[in-house]
């Protein structure tokens, strides 16, 4: 039986941040700049796990495709999916974003850090002023959610 040769995935440019780097930068901005009363968190649903752990989490309600960040502000729920500049949504992510919208939540897909910050500003989560911009080398610690 002949094996099909797979074409390698194109390598990311050294100057293009990974999805993880974008995610961490967005969370840093939220920790430092989110309006008072905004709650945000990352539902850990997309990581690779051992089969036993995955089965336990699935039984507990972990669902594939949930947006990278869930935000709650002023009685509204937001789901933000983060992608690299050329990143694509999976089938499960498309379905979940549609389900969020049908349930009344606001959703968006951000391709890159600038897009994510623009969306969060448009939603009123981050202030529109650029006076509080985060320095690129800043590191924050603490929980991945904000408590008013």
Give residue spans per PLM region.
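Catalytic phosphate/metal-binding cores of nucleic-acid and nucleotide-processing enzymes, i.e., regions
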Residues: 1-148
């Amino acid at each position: 039986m002949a094996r099909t040769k797979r074409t390698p995935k194109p390598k990311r440019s050294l100057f293009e941040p990974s999805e993880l780097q974008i995610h961490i930068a967005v969370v840093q901005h939220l920790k430092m700049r989110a309006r008072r009363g905004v709650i945000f968190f990352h539902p850990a649903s997309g990581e690779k796990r051992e089969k036993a752990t995955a089965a336990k989490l699935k039984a507990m309600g972990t669902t594939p495709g949930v947006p990278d960040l869930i935000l709650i502000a002023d009685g509204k729920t937001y789901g933000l999916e983060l992608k690299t500049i050329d990143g694509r949504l999976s089938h499960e992510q498309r379905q979940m974003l549609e389900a969020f919208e049908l349930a009344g939540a606001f959703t968006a897909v951000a391709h890159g850090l600038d897009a994510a910050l623009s969306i969060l500003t448009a939603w009123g989560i981050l202030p529109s002023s650029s006076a509080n911009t985060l320095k690129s080398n800043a590191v924050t610690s603490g929980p991945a959610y904000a408590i008013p």
